[in-house]
Curated annotation (Swiss-Prot):
Null allele phenotype: Null mice exhibits aberrant expression of brain area-specific genes and structural organization in the somatosensory and caudal motor cortices. In somatosensory cortex, vibrissal barrels display postsynaptic disorganization. In caudal motor cortex, anomalous differentiation of corticospinal motor neurons is observed, accompanied by failure of corticospinal tract formation. Mice also develop self-inflicted skin lesions and show significantly enhanced scratching responses to pruritic agents, due to the selective loss of a subset of spinal cord inhibitory interneurons.
Assembly: Interacts with PRDM8.
Stored InterPro entries: bHLH_dom, bHLH_transcription_factors, HLH_DNA-bd_sf
UniProt KW keywords: Neurogenesis, Nucleus, Repressor, Transcription, Transcription regulation
Natural source organism: Mus musculus
Stretches with biased composition (Gly residues): 81-90, 185-207
Occurrences of domain bHLH (ranges): 216-270
Record's protein name: Class E basic helix-loop-helix protein 22
Originating gene: Bhlhe22
Region (Disordered): 34-90, 128-215
Function text: Inhibits DNA binding of TCF3/E47 homodimers and TCF3 (E47)/NEUROD1 heterodimers and acts as a strong repressor of Neurod1 and Myod-responsive genes, probably by heterodimerization with class a basic helix-loop-helix factors. Despite the presence of an intact basic domain, does not bind to DNA. In the brain, may function as an area-specific transcription factor that regulates the postmitotic acquisition of area identities and elucidate the genetic hierarchy between progenitors and postmitotic neurons driving neocortical arealization.
GO biological process entries: amacrine cell differentiation; anterior commissure morphogenesis; central nervous system projection neuron axonogenesis; cerebral cortex regionalization; corpus callosum morphogenesis; corticospinal tract morphogenesis; GABAergic neuron differentiation; negative regulation of DNA-templated transcription
GO cellular component: nucleoplasm; nucleus
Gene3D superfamilies to which the protein is assigned, alphabetical: Helix-loop-helix DNA-binding domain
Pfam families: HLH (PF00010)
Amino acid sequence: MERGLHLGAAAASEDDLFLHKSLGTSAAKRLEAAFRSTPPGMDLSLAPPTRERPASSSSPLGCFEPADPEGAGLRLPPPGGGGGASGGGGGVSVPGLLVGSAGVGGEPSLSSLPAGAALCLKYGESAGRGSVAESSGGEQSPDDDSDGLCELVLRAGGPDPRASPRAGGGSAKVAEGCSNAHLHGGSGLPPGGPTSGGGSGGGGGGSSKKSKEQKALRLNINARERRRMHDLNDALDELRAVIPYAHSPSVRKLSKIATLLLAKNYILMQAQALEEMRRLVAYLNQGQAISAASLPSSAAAAAAAAALHPALGAYEQAAGYPFSAGLPPAASCPEKCALFNSVSSSLCKQCTEKP
């Protein structure tokens, strides 16, 4: 019984090894084609350097060696069976694949199959999808170079080369932006940034200069207005000094309007007094031809003149008129001038000129 079990286990291990060898041959071809041939649109210049395999390695298991130096990839149990911790810890890493104790890709449905068979099934599905998407003409077999592993590598390392032209245009724009940033020293500012900043600085300088000019003009206007007001006040003070009733001790200082009104009334009064003086001089000039019969008429004229202006009451001559009808006018001329002693001597000019 035990011998039969040992023979059955040995036969199963031999079948598993044969299946794994056949899988290794086909997988090696696909992996080599995927890593050696660069599809259009894929740039491997930024990809991490791969470790070179020794040329003497002709084992079909060489394709399962780790392709990246960091060992990124997941573990594959060795082809000899050995479950438990020895099967999980002693495997080799395959980039982009997940093969463990739970099956391929973490699927429990494939955990009952041997590792090689599960891997073969997974590769078959991926190859079918990749061949339909990337075929340029005719049908491709699952053993062809275009498999799902290349798609996984491209998606992990860079953008998909089968993307739309719109996405390609976007990447070209990004590259152009990066080149512009390098050309401008990596400052991140647009080319017109410093120029626009200088223009704003120049505008600020112009506005400050304009404000200074306006301030100087305003100061000049204020100074001129101050001088004008000072001159006006001085002129009004001189006018108050001339007006008789403006500088009295009992009268407070008049305002500007009151000073101007008082000056107007004083000028009108002086004009009226001058007119009365002219009438009196005309009357004196006509007195040489006056007779005794004309005395009442002259007295009436003097009364009318006194009624016009009270100041002329001192010049009233009706009561004590010094002239008489029988006296010559030459004898009465000095007496007439003596009555008007307050008037200037030019009024009696005719008395001094006559013999």
